[in-house]
């Protein structure tokens, strides 16, 4: 049964306000709340003893969506979930994931998710993932999420991956890996907000193995209060390829940010670029908004929203 709290979590992490269109699997408190397959997208529970599902998308599937959100409303719940995606050739699909935790007590609630993609040739996949946490009024339970995403990208295929950590995650360790074949392209946009005493680590590896493979990473983060962030993207060129890593961060209060981009070329025809910048909000930007009638707090929030948009 979907409660009012569940519905709010689903809207925040997957923009769902009712029953999803197309294939979906809604996981709630380590169980399946609802599941639906379609003619072209089949979702089945794992049979190897692991928690999780297999998603099989038939070759030639175009214009379809698949929603697989996870919500947790219990305190003290910890789970490790494996979801495997098999995307056929010549597909064009959107996959919407994400996890939301409403911690109802003082114990730690934790979701560790391992997503592995096997994407065929000449396909396009848009994958989005939002993470959000909150505590019930008066409660202090920690919210922890550790996502791992592994993508095997076939020839001439494209994956656009958008990841967002909205708020309320006390600790996260992200592990993202791409293995790109000939003519394939990956674009990763990571947006992260930490506050309080939260900690976030993000390790990313993109191997451009095939000729004319392309990779691009855009990381934007904001660290507030005493929070800590470490971002370590690695781009490896093993053939004639192009890769670009861009990391921009805003630091506030007594926060700590480390941005450690790395590029490695194992081929003379690999073209790899990395950029990293960390700074505070410029005073003239705040002043300009304040002259338009915004309070200092409203001006700051407006700038942060635009930066993370």
Regions found by a protein language model. Give the residues of each.
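C-terminal functional modules
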Residues: 1-26, 30
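Conserved beta-strand/loop scaffold segments within soluble protein domains that form the structured core
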Residues: 25-28, 33-294, 304-309
């Amino acid at each position: 049964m979907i409660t009012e709290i569940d519905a709010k979590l689903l809207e925040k992490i997957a923009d769902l306000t009712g029953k999803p269109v197309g294939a979906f699997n809604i996981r709630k408190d380590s169980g399946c709340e609802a599941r639906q397959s379609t003619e072209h997208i089949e979702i089945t529970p794992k049979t190897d003893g692991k928690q999780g599902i297999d998603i099989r998308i038939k070759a030639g599937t175009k214009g379809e969506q698949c929603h697989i959100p996870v919500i947790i409303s219990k305190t003290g719940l910890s789970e490790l979930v494996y979801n495997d995606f098999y995307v056929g050739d010549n597909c064009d699909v959107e996959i919407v994931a994400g996890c939301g935790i409403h911690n109802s007590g003082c114990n730690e609630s934790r979701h560790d998710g391992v997503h592995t993609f096997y994407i065929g040739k000449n396909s396009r996949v848009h994958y989005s993932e939002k993470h959000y946490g909150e505590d019930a009024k008066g409660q202090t339970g920690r919210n922890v999420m550790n996502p791992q995403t592994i993508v095997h990208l076939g020839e001439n295929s494209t994956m656009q991956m958008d990841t967002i950590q909205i708020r309320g995650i006390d600790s996260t360790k992200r592990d993202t890996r791409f293995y790109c074949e000939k003519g394939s392209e990956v674009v990763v946009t990571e947006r992260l907000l930490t506050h309080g005493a939260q900690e976030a680590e993000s390790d990313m590896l993109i191997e451009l193995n095939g000729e004319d493979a392309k990779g691009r990473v855009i990381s934007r983060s904001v660290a507030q209060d005493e929070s800590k962030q470490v971002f370590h993207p690695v781009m490896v060129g093993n053939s004639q390829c192009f890769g670009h890593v861009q990391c921009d961060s805003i630091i506030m209060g007594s926060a700590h940010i480390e941005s450690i981009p790395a590029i490695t070329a194992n081929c003379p025809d690999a073209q790899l670029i990395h950029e990293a910048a960390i700074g505070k909000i410029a005073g003239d930007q705040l002043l300009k908004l304040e002259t338009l009638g915004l309070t200092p707090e409203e001006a700051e929030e407006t700038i942060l929203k635009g930066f993370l948009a």
